[in-house]
């Protein structure tokens, strides 16, 4: 017989469920997706492992090879607000004008038995008036029909702001790249016009370039245009083969 002070197991009985067999459905799904993502990531990493043997430059201008600069001309262009002016038109005969040869370097800075890997068109822009506060804009196209006649002045539509040192740089290399032409010095000294047509434009794009400013006033811009040749160096930093001759 139970008294009021006796322990009766049927009175006030509580049930406690062990929670280790019950999991939140959201955490189960998230954990499964996380495991699947890790498995796919490991597979992708394994496929990319062979590429770790190669080195890629973030900027092709700073990649392997030697940069040789050929200054073509310097001149002043007046640009009106909200417009861009044509400064380079390789589709015509603009490279034959006198101002190009006036600032041409006396000797071509490329010696024999070297290969052109890439050609960069470099346009350096500087304001001629002091205490001016504006940014330079530029647009370019790499290909056009030989008979295409571009407009001298266009309206500003989706331009690119010119970056460091007010220098606009365009890679003219075609897909596949390279210009396997030797004896470049003799080609250039024989005839500059033939060198441009036969060597450069046979292997690289002809650009059309417009420049402008975001200023609300008419501005004078001093332009310096040059071609920078990325030259393949035939003396690698590390030997390709190991042996007694190296």
From Swiss-Prot:
InterPro entries hit by this protein? Polyhedrin
Q: Which GO cellular component does the record give, naming just one?
A: viral occlusion body
Top-rank lineage group of the source organism: Viruses
Q: Which cysteines are joined by disulfide bonds?
A: none
MF annotations from Gene Ontology: structural molecule activity
Tell me the Pfam families matching this sequence. Polyhedrin
Role this protein plays: Major component of the virus occlusion bodies, which are large proteinaceous structures (polyhedra), that protect the virus from the outside environment for extended periods until they are ingested by insect larvae.
The family line of this record is: Belongs to the polyhedrin family.
Entry protein name: Polyhedrin
Q: What gene does the UniProt entry assign to this protein?
A: PH
């Amino acid at each position: 017989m139970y008294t009021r002070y006796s322990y009766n197991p049927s009175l006030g009985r509580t049930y406690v469920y062990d929670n280790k067999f019950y999991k939140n459905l959201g955490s189960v799904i998230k954990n499964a997706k996380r495991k699947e993502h890790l498995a796919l990531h490991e597979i992708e990493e394994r496929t990319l492992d062979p590429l770790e043997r190669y080195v890629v430059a973030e900027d092709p201008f700073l990649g392997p090879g030697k940069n040789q600069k050929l200054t073509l001309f310097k001149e002043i262009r007046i640009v009106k607000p909200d417009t861009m002016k044509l400064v380079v038109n390789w589709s015509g005969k603009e490279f034959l004008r006198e101002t190009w040869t006036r600032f041409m370097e006396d000797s071509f800075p490329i010696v024999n038995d070297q290969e052109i890997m890439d050609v960069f068109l470099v346009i350096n822009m500087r304001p001629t008036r002091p205490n001016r506060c504006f940014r330079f804009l530029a647009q370019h196209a790499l290909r056009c029909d030989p008979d295409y006649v571009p407009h001298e002045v266009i309206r500003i539509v989706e331009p690119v702001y010119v970056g460091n040192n007010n220098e606009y740089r365009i890679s003219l290399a075609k897909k596949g790249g390279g210009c396997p032409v030797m004896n470049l010095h003799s080609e250039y000294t024989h005839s500059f016009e033939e060198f441009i047509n036969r060597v450069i434009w046979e292997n690289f794009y002809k650009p059309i370039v417009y420049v402008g400013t975001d200023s609300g006033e008419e501005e004078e811009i001093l332009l310096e245009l040059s071609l920078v040749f990325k030259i393949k160096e035939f003396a690698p930093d590390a030997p390709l083969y190991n042996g007694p001759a190296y």
